[in-house]
Amino acid sequence: MAEKKIFGYADKISVKPGDDISFYVHADGTDVVDAQLVRLIHGDAHPAGPGYKEEEIANEANGVWRVRKQFTQVGSFLTVADPEQRLALSGSFSLCTFVHANSPGGGRRQCLLGRWDAFGNRGYGLWLNPDGFLEFGFGDGGEVDYLDAEVPVLKNNWYFVAATFDAKTGVATLYQEGVATRYNSLLSKVANVDFRSHVRETLRFRPVNPPEIPFLLAGARDHHTLRGDFVTQCLNGKLDRPSVFDRVLTRAELDSYRDGGVPPQDGLLAFWDTTQGYTEHGIGDEVIDAGPYGLHAIGYNRPVRAQTGFNWQGRDDCFRLAPQQYGGIEFHDDAIIDCKWELTRSIKVPDVRSGAYAFRLRTGDAKGMREEYVVFFVRPLKPKAPILFLVPTGSYLAYANEHLSFDAEIMQPLAGQSPILSEVDIELYQTAEFGLSLYDHHADGAGVCYSTYRRPILNMRPKARMSSMGVTWQFPADLSIIAWLDHMGYDYEVMTDEDVHREGIDALKPYNVVLSGTHPEYVSEPILDATEDYIGAGGRFIYLGGNGYYWNVGYHSEDPWCMEVRKLNSGMRAWQARPGEYYLATTGQKSGLWKDLGRPPQKLFGVGFISEGFDSARPFRRMPDSWHRRASWIMEGIEGEIIGDFGLAQGAAGGIEIDRYDLTLGTPPHSLIVASSGGHSDNYQTVVEEVLYPYPGLSGSHDYRVRADMVYFTAPNDGAVFSTGSIAFSQSLPYRNFDNNVSRLLGNVVTAFSKPGKLPGWAWTAEEKQWR
């Protein structure tokens, strides 16, 4: 019998009581699981804390669920709507496209375009063959006839390729020409390589084109007895302006098409103009057929738009300025946006308190892959509590199913330790159906720019630890804040990034104070705007993280579960977007760091990212500002000057990723530094965006800037901000069952911030700082 494994996901990440939510579960080795609704309280099993905590919730859906093996279509491609079967060609024809191959060869066949049935060897197609050569062929249901180019297609270079077939004579031709400009390809004209190939051959028979075979771009249909039809031979690379004709194009016509990107009109059946559809706010998944029949194509697993095309000239770096140069649409054979599993169970969300919830699924011994938590967050029907915990779900998506311990060569020196792998980590790495994170590369080397929660996310579970660092990260780390709020008896509610992105400041207005998560790194402009407007209008914000509000991301307007980022020329980044591909297809905005867009987090929270180190953490020490009459109340009940020389994340409150006060980047000038960390190891390096020239001394034991600053300042209309500047801070809260000076300090701030009216120390707000 197969080893028992269960994995699942939900169709929503944020719900209210009374909402419907659906669950999708995959199982190997069993057809039943035991399901239990639980409220998640604390997610870190570290022995220095209270341990893992959950609360079982009575619900009619508790009990045995029937489950089954599920199948996932991996890889992005385009499906053409062809109801009248105009592309089921029976006579002469031509296939044309511009192509930029990311990883030709390598033993993989990649279909550029065609109507090919890989299971039955029927239809026709234009491929990159397993050796990386352009190939045209067709099948009659038994045999397949192929025609191959003479020279291979080189990776990351633009080509114009075409195949023609004369039904009267049986003659097929292949046309392959390089179309590199000074900007668009890896190689320039000085490289002494042969891009050109023109071959001609008489094929033995005619293709068979059954009506049920779909016309696909960047893939071909296949079939399996258990899963049915699916798409295989997915392309790794870009296509631009592909087309189909019902006649043989001449060499002169192909040359003209190659030079200008405009196809001849005579005999044109379809011309997918990949430059059409751009707006000020991006572009969707539909690719317009500008030919006579409107055979439009729709993307599956979100082929990447807003990519440079064959004719990109380097002058304009945004599709809004030169859409005709942005015909590139990029495909990856390991892309996933939505697993589209069959439904396992739907429920109506019960009338429960706001918080973090999951259906806990178990089979067998309920260890490792025999236990699954399908997590979601419950908002209140109407806000009532004074305190909101803003769940940074965008950042959860960014790290979802990351492969850093396996694929990132720098991870061990960066972390300063060897990874500690579990069987779940290994299963995640070996299973393509779980997809990738925004810290990974596709198999072809391109950075991953999309992430989604319509798939199992194995590290968005309680108890999960980041294998490369040995600490909880993102969601399970944020449960330390929820556990603290619970333990302290505060009246609080939760909401997600997705909610604030959609509703803006109206989502935050009802609350006296908003608490962030430990690492709210990825935020959209609506989230950033709402946070700034909330504070400016008198709201109070407690920033409990490090490296927060760092990357500008976009959410797909119709698919809120899908988030996009482009990583540009600055910032601590796992990959680098290609030149000209810096703008988000989902919003039309330039991505990258908010700092580089004029909105560094210092302007909002008083602190911003300065360093990271994963080998150790350091305590905070009180700074002179902490005795100022404006801020001394924050330290009430705290003895001595050292704060947080303990914790569940590397043993102290200041560390992992840390932020500092910086007036040159917009820290409000009246901000008070109430405490700072120091003495960090040399594993803590100054972040690259703060370095113009590298030089010896940019590390924790040398650079005075490498520190976490705890900052407090007041804002208009009785608003205020308190920032910890450290990811590790909140993971010190549970130490010794929440009886510690970090817990006491945060309690002082939350209690004061959550009460209406003036803050302690308000009478001295206009007083100058006594220390600089």
Positions of the model-derived regions?
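Short, aromatic- and glycine-rich surface loops/edge beta-strands on solvent-exposed regions
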Residues: 68-69, 355-361
